[in-house]
């Protein structure tokens, strides 16, 4: 809906496997930035600056991350925002699907929240699959600039039309209903995380950092 031939999309790595292919299928060019363990597998402002060109259309951010479990802090997002402030042609796609799965007192932040000047340049993606354990129901949603949402609606309506009506009704109940189960669900994820991290770090030749969110460990 927004990419023309040759437009570039910046994708911090490690990333969810489909990100680059989605760009290629839309005739765009993925610009992958390797983010190592020393930065917590997170994009640094100086690396973002170096990779922005006149053809850059989007920056993709996923926090908490699939597959690393890394989370951007408020300060880290603000630092990225200061770079983007200088490049008004670049939009941000914020994949917030794991926003409610966080551990150890970490607080979820999204870039449009901490950088209000990016509000009109941010497309937020979310869904019910992760936090509400509704993977098979196939319900997602987006919020962003009106012109982009309208363009997305045109593509969506000719692609898959809509999800099943029962899925939409169930999603309304999930979003509006009792949210206390999320905390207990996260406690189960936390126990599994700690067990996996402990065993990996005790295994010769393997190591991993402790993820702040999501339900992945990257070793």
Tell me what each language-model feature is.
Residues 172, 188-197, 208-219:
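Conserved glycine-rich beta-strand-loop-beta hairpin in the small C-terminal domain of fold type I
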Residues 152-156, 175-197:
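Structural signature of PLP-dependent enzymes
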Residues 7, 28, 84-91, 119-120:
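A short helix->loop->beta-strand "cap" motif at the edges of active sites that frequently abuts
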Residues 1-8:
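Phosphate-binding glycine-rich loop
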Residues 114-151, 163:
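Active-site PLP attachment segment
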Residues 21, 25-31:
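A short helix-loop-beta submotif of the ANL/AMP-binding
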Residues 36-106:
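Active-site phosphate-binding strand-loop segment of PLP-dependent enzymes
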